[in-house]
């Protein structure tokens, strides 16, 4: 199988064997040209000869059409994920036309009917979603730590330092530290507040910034880097069975 995740800035792919083990995986910046990037990967995909391609995409219809045209060259069946608030594996109170595909798949990859869960995606945006025994209750969306920093530096003339690390939430003694610690605290504080409101929910985090944020959260956190891939596999496995 070939699994594709077309995000806001990056294209990720996983090639898995017949028992679901990952045999090849990579992530690349697509610069809003995912079809062109895929064209350069066609030879690699052909060598593994996957029998199906499952696709998660948050891109618009125009880019998805170009992606489809490129994938058609492989002569392999492919299908895009479609968010469904009434999906049997997880019901959702959310408007499914506004629920991002990647966000939904992250939840689908984590959902457990026996548990209450708080699923946090730490990518271009930070998404926090509450799931009660496979029922999505809704959630929150924040700009990522890097988007917050970019916005602050582009909109504030007095703050011109754009480098630094997100490694502490104590008060800063320089503008650089104050900016980075304030931004990190805004995310960590929100997670801690939501966790306090929902103390019986297991906290699960995924995404590129998950490890940075998780170490400052005041609850045990389960880090999962495979949620979207697991969600893709679950979605298409269930679709085939249905």
From Swiss-Prot:
GO CC terms of this entry: cytoplasm
Name the pathway it acts in. Answer: Cofactor biosynthesis; coenzyme A biosynthesis; CoA from (R)-pantothenate: step 1/5
Q: How is the cofactor bound?
A: A monovalent cation. Ammonium or potassium.
Q: Which CDD domains match?
A: ASKHA_NBD_PanK-III (cd24015)
State its Enzyme Commission number(s).
2.7.1.33
Report the locations given in the UniProt record.
Answer: Cytoplasm
| Cofactors named for this entry | NH4(+); K(+)
Q: Which reaction does it catalyse?
A: (R)-pantothenate + ATP = (R)-4'-phosphopantothenate + ADP + H(+)
**Which keywords does this chain's UniProt record carry?**
ATP-binding, Coenzyme A biosynthesis, Cytoplasm, Kinase, Nucleotide-binding, Potassium, Transferase
The residues that the entry says bind substrate are 94, 100-103, 175
Q: What class of enzyme is it?
A: transferase
Question: Which Pfam families does the UniProt record give?
Answer: Pan_kinase
Highest taxon above the source species: Bacteria
Q: Which GO terms describe its biological process?
A: coenzyme A biosynthetic process
User: What is the annotated role of this protein in its UniProt record?
Assistant: Catalyzes the phosphorylation of pantothenate (Pan), the first step in CoA biosynthesis.
Extract the PANTHER family matched here.
TYPE III PANTOTHENATE KINASE
Question: Into which family does the record put it?
Answer: Belongs to the type III pantothenate kinase family.
Q: Fill in the subunit field for this protein.
A: Homodimer.
Designated name of the protein: Type III pantothenate kinase
């Amino acid at each position: 199988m070939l699994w594709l995740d077309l995000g806001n800035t990056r294209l990720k792919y996983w090639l898995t064997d017949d028992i679901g083990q990952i045999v090849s995986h990579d992530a690349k910046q697509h610069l809003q040209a995912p079809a062109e990037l895929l064209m350069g990967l066609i030879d690699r995909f052909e060598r593994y000869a996957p029998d199906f391609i499952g696709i998660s995409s948050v891109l618009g219809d125009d880019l998805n059409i170009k992606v489809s045209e490129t994938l058609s060259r492989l002569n392999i069946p492919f299908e895009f994920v479609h968010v469904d608030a009434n999906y049997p594996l997880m019901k959702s109170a959310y408007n499914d036309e506004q629920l991002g595909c990647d966000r939904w798949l992250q939840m689908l990859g984590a959902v457990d009917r026996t548990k209450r869960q708080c699923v946090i995606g730490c990518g271009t945006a930070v998404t926090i979603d509450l799931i009660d025994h496979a029922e999505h209750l809704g959630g929150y969306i924040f700009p990522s730590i890097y988007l917050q920093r970019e916005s602050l530096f582009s909109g504030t003339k007095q703050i011109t330092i754009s480098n630094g690390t997100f490694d502490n939430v104590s008060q800063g003694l320089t503008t650089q530290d104050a900016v980075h610690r304030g931004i990190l605290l805004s995310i960590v504080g929100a997670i801690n507040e939501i966790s306090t409101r929902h103390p019986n929910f297991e906290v699960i985090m995924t995404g590129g910034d998950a490890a940075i944020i998780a170490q400052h959260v005041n609850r045990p956190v389960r880090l999962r880097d495979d949620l979207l891939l697991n969600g893709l596999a679950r979605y298409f496995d269930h679709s085939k069975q249905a």
